Design a protein with these regions (language model features):
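ATP-dependent helicase/translocase motor core
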Residues: 2-323, 332, 336-348, 377, ...
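Interdomain helical connector at the RecA1-RecA2 junction of SF1/SF2 helicase-like NTPases
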Residues: 232-238, 467-565, 582, 586
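Inter-Walker segment of RecA-like/P-loop motor cores
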Residues: 342-385
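Conserved RecA-like ASCE ATPase "motif II neighborhood" in helicase/translocase motors
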Residues: 369-415, 422, 435-447, 625-633, ...
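Post-DEXD/H (motif II) to motif III coupling segment of the RecA-like Helicase ATP-binding lobe
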Residues: 406-500
Length: 982
């Protein structure tokens, strides 16, 4: 086979022939005007075919010069307005009174045959080996695509079979041999998009800037959720580029509906997954009508804000949708959404950022035709003014469906849009008054998604929970799953985000406490241990020790990153911890003469040692014109603000590309919280590295949390979906307590419905029920009250999931919520002042693993079903001696024992020989075996000698897989150090 056949010629010809067979025509070299970078033949052929009458009037004015004059007007128009805008506007001439369209788009035409006929007469032409220079030996582009004589797309092809890749040779060719100063390559004056592709991967850019040209991946994603493309039987993996994207209809849609110039002057071309998600949603609504639910699982780095904006634009143009509402709970995203919506649509007044009065929103909802961008906090005040209108249809786009966006107010938002009454909205407030902090309130409030016949929901999230999946997921043969997905793995491999787990260091804390005084009082054991842990972890010794570790690490090893701009974030477990760290860190920075500062982020006021602290007061050094700045402005505007201390703030919705380092001193006890928190590091920057130091969390658990959202399938199996009939069982179980009857419930509901909540009849009835309640044993009273509360949550959740509203069950949900408020005896336990009970006598924190990589893999995962049981927390009462014993067993002495184990086993000659001469897997197994034997010896020794503490320690250690792995790795590291030293 000839060498040229191995290169791109057959590849080029295959694409060329395909496009010619699907609506393109061949361009001719003789028709190309090098000076104006236009195909004159195709330009005027289009005008003759679509606007002949206007062209005749134009000819009558300019005679034989009409072509020259029109080209002048066209070039002037593009020069003033840019090509992208000009394609959607007129080329006008005052002297002749004419105006011409450069192209016809379906969305800009009526559905009459005349309009479609004009659309079909757009001329798409293609040139291969396109010589764009008028020289004897010009540079050539493999393929050039024109629309009505105007160059739109340039394509350079490479073949990996010839040792060339698009990502390397293709991008380099555009960077080095295509002069952006030439008209045809000038930004937004001629060519709009540049592709380079080989058989396996595709990349594009919209601006050539020599070596600064940035190409983005334009790939579908591989079978294993990574970068690249899947195998296509019998075809090139990149065939979608010419078979789908470059097809006439699709390319015109992209130009008209997706491409835009952003606020920074960049021309935006949708990434593949953005285009796919929007079009799939639009097509499904067209096929199945309004009323669907769509879970869009797009990772950080997916460009979610733009995807939401494009989707909102498509939905507001849907003939069956009156109003689009975009809801976000983050001010920064809220603002970005408003800006992006204006960018992608360009119509003033269509995208409305509602932050004024309730009447403003009410008017927009009633008028229809608007995209309303708002937060629930701004949306809520007027919800009860809007009555149901079944003839109006809505699209609700929820940003981060697991967050507080979907909270208690969301249920009321849906009540407004589905037309439920004021009374029902008030009842919802009662039912959901006591939701647990940090949970997905929308998913617990199911009422938010009820009666969706006139509402389509589009829920965007990077970290879907099982409740999110059940409410918004698409049903498949195996259960419910996402509608569209862009994985974390693909985002990382395509370099839109960084992997924040590449460099991870973990520590383990050890504490020993003693009691201060004799005390026989019994305390709630769990609360007492929590109070003690809070007390010891805010002690001066602990705070100063960790401050020393963190800041010495940052100063010695991290502060030079990003040319001295790197910032670090300290994740603290409470506001008090944040205040303590701020004071200690400022003292450390002053003592060591560091040339940078810290800031702190927390809410409210904290009192410490008789002094009151607020975020604003502690950040008083950062002033702008004498006025305190908000925390995000402080961080973004002050390069010397390099240590950011946070307590439940800035862990989501915070973008700072200079954030390279994270020090974690807080338990991250859920996959959503862990991924969101640590992923603050993943924003990209040139030459950026990341580092995590974790004092609290098990690295294996962090790995498991990230693996859930890294890639692979994520679904709720059919057998784990919530059984709606559980409501009947719950109802019967509640009635079996013989506290309230169905007749009682009906009477209570009728009195509430009649607005007679203060009537004597209701009071008497509730008093009778209260008497029955008090007759129960204490444990049964608590269980009964919790069943009442659980019933309401289950009812609204199940009603939302199954889109079935049972009026009888609704009445019970309302009544049971009222009874819960009346009957539930909230336990008031005095605060435990641990400082009066115990003192910290010994503390150390030991390095467990240093600068290792937490390996992630794409694994299919199935959600468990949601719990429908009521679980009352067991309350164990203990005296302080027992509490101290349990605390010390958990946190004390372990460092000495573990240190002895590491020292003894690392000195073992057989193990040293194994590490020196065996494979990694072999010596890891050998060390693990010896470690297990050593632990059994310790357990036996403690048991035989009656050393209960030692026996319990080794028992607990033998069951702690993560600790065993860390100890094994420490032994291996020490052996390697000893071998190296010898």
């Amino acid at each position: 086979m000839a060498e040229k056949d191995l290169r791109e010629n057959p590849f080029r010809d295959e694409i060329y022939d395909y496009l010619l067979a699907h609506g393109y025509v061949a361009g001719q070299k003789a028709d190309y005007d090098y000076k104006h970078a236009l195909d004159i033949g195709k330009l005027f052929a289009f005008l003759e075919a679509t606007q002949a009458e206007e062209l005749e009037r134009f000819k009558a004015t300019y005679g034989s010069r009409y072509q020259e004059r029109y080209v002048e007007l066209l070039c002037q128009k593009i020069e003033n307005r840019g090509l992208l805008t000009s394609l959607n506007e007129w080329v006008e001439d005052y002297a002749s009174g004419t105006k011409f369209s450069l192209a016809f788009f379906k969305s800009g035409l009526n559905a009459m045959s005349e309009g479609l006929e004009l659309y079909e007469k757009n001329v798409f032409s293609i040139r291969k080996e396109f010589s764009f220079e008028d020289k004897p030996e010009p540079y050539r582009v493999d393929l050039a695509l024109f629309l009505n004589g105007i160059p739109l797309v340039m394509i350079e092809l490479k073949k990996q079979t010839a040792g060339q890749k698009a990502v390397f040779e293709g991008t380099k060719q555009f960077q080095t041999t295509r002069n952006p100063g030439e008209l045809i390559f000038s930004f937004n004056r001629r060519t709009l998009v540049y592709f380079t592709l080989d058989e396996f991967a595709a990349f594009l850019t919209t601006r050539l800037d020599r070596k600064e040209t940035k190409f983005l991946p334009f790939n579908r994603g591989s079978e294993d959720e990574g970068a690249g493309n899947p195998v296509v039987p019998g075809k090139h993996s990149t065939c979608y580029v010419w078979e789908d994207i470059l097809q006439r209809d699709m390319l015109l849609r992209i130009i008209r509906e997706f491409m835009f110039i952003d606020d920074e002057g960049a021309m935006i071309f949708p990434r593949f997954h953005q285009l796919r998600a929007v079009l799939r949603c639009e097509q499904d609504v067209q096929k199945n009508g309004v009323g669907g639910r769509y879970l869009i699982w797009h990772s950080a780095g997916s460009g979610k804000t733009k995807t939401i904006a494009w989707l909102a634009k498509r939905m507001i143009n849907h003939p069956d949708i009156n109003t689009v509402i975009v809801i976000s709970d983050r001010t920064v995203i809220d603002g970005q959404l408003g800006a992006e919506l204006m960018n992608v649509d360009g119509k003033k007044g269509v995208a409305q950022h509602i932050d004024t009065t309730s009447k403003d929103l009410l008017k927009k909802l009633n008028d229809g035709g608007y995209i309303i961008v708002t937060t629930l906090q701004k949306f809520r005040p007027i919800l009860n003014e809007i009555k149901r209108n079944e003839e109006r249809n809505y699209a609700i786009i929820i940003d981060e469906a697991h967050s507080s966006t979907a909270g208690k107010s969301m249920s009321k938002a849906s009540e407004t849009l589905t037309g439920k009454s004021l009374k029902e909205s008030v009842e919802l407030d009662d039912v959901y008054e006591d939701l647990e902090d940090g949970q997905n309130q929308l998913l617990r409030d199911g009422a938010a998604i009820r009666s969706t016949k006139n509402v389509s929901y589009f829920a965007f999230t990077a970290t879907p929970k099982k409740e999110t999946m059940e409410l918004f997921g698409t049903r498949t043969e195996i259960g419910k799953t996402y509608f569209d997905k862009y994985s974390m793995r693909q985002a990382i491999e395509e370099r839109f985000i960084l992997n924040p787990l590449l460099c991870y260091t973990s520590y383990q804390d050890f504490y020993r406490i003693e009691k201060k005084k004799e005390d026989d009082t019994e305390y709630d054991s769990a609360k007492a241990q929590a109070a003690i842990l809070n007390y010891v972890t805010t002690s001066d010794e602990v705070i100063q020790t960790k401050t020393e570790i963190m800041l010495s690490d940052f100063i010695e090893r991290r502060q030079t990153w990003l040319e001295g701009r790197a910032k670090a974030m300290i994740i603290t477990p409470s506001r008090k911890h944040a205040v303590c760290y701020k004071l200690a860190i400022d003292e450390y920075l002053k003592k060591h003469g560091c040339g940078f500062r810290s800031c702190v982020a927390f809410t409210g006021t904290i009192e410490l040692d008789g002094l009151k602290f607020t975020e604003e007061q502690m950040n008083k050094d950062y002033l702008e014109h004498g006025v305190p700045c908000d925390i995000k402005s402080i961080i973004h505007k002050n390069d010397d603000c390099r240590i950011i201390i946070v307590a439940d703030k800035l862990q989501t919705g915070f973008d700072e590309d200079a954030l390279c380092v994270m020090y974690i001193d807080k338990k991250l006890n859920s996959s959503v919280k862990a991924v969101q928190t640590i992923s603050r590091l993943n924003r990209t920057a040139h030459n950026k590295r990341t580092f995590v130091m974790d004092f609290v969390n098990d690295p294996d658990m962090i790995q498991a949390f990230f693996t859930q959202y890294y890639g692979g399938e994520l679904y709720l199996p059919t057998e784990n979906e919530t059984d709606p009939n559980i409501l009947f069982a719950k109802r019967d179980h509640i009635l079996d307590y013989c506290v309230v009857t169905l007749l009682d419930a009906q009477k209570i509901y009728s009195l509430i419905s009649a607005n007679e909540e203060s009537s004597g009849e209701l009071t008497s009835l509730l008093a009778s029920i209260s008497r029955n309640y008090r007759a129960l044993e204490p444990d049964r009273r608590k269980a009964f009250a919790l069943e009442l509360k659980k019933f309401g949550k289950l009812f609204y959740y199940i009603s939302a999931v199954y889109n079935v509203w049972n009026p009888d069950m609704e009445q019970l949900a309302v009544v049971f919520s009222v009874l819960y408020n009346v009957l539930y005896e909230r336990e008031v336990t005095p605060d435990i002042d641990a400082s009066e009970l115990v003192e910290l006598v010994e503390y150390s924190t030991k390095l467990s693993q240093e600068e290792f990589t937490i390996i992630l893999s794409a694994e299919d995962q199935a959600f468990d079903g949601i719990s429908t049981d009521v679980a009352a927390a067991d309350r164990t009462m203990s005296v302080i001696d027992e509490i101290i014993e349990k605390f010390n067993l958990r946190y004390a002495h372990a460092d000495e024992e573990i240190g002895d184990i590491i020292t003894d086993l690392s000195s073992d000659k057989d193990l040293q020989s194994n590490v020196q001469n065996s494979s990694t897997s072999a010596y890891e197994a050998a060390v693990a075996e010896r470690l297990s034997s050593r632990i059994m010896d310790g357990l036996f020794d403690g048991t035989v000698n009656g050393d209960t503490e030692k026996a319990e320690f080794y028992t607990e250690l033998s069951e702690n897989t993560s600790a065993l792995i860390q100890i094994r790795n420490s032994i291996i590291r020490k052996i390697k150090d000893l071998l190296l030293a010898s």
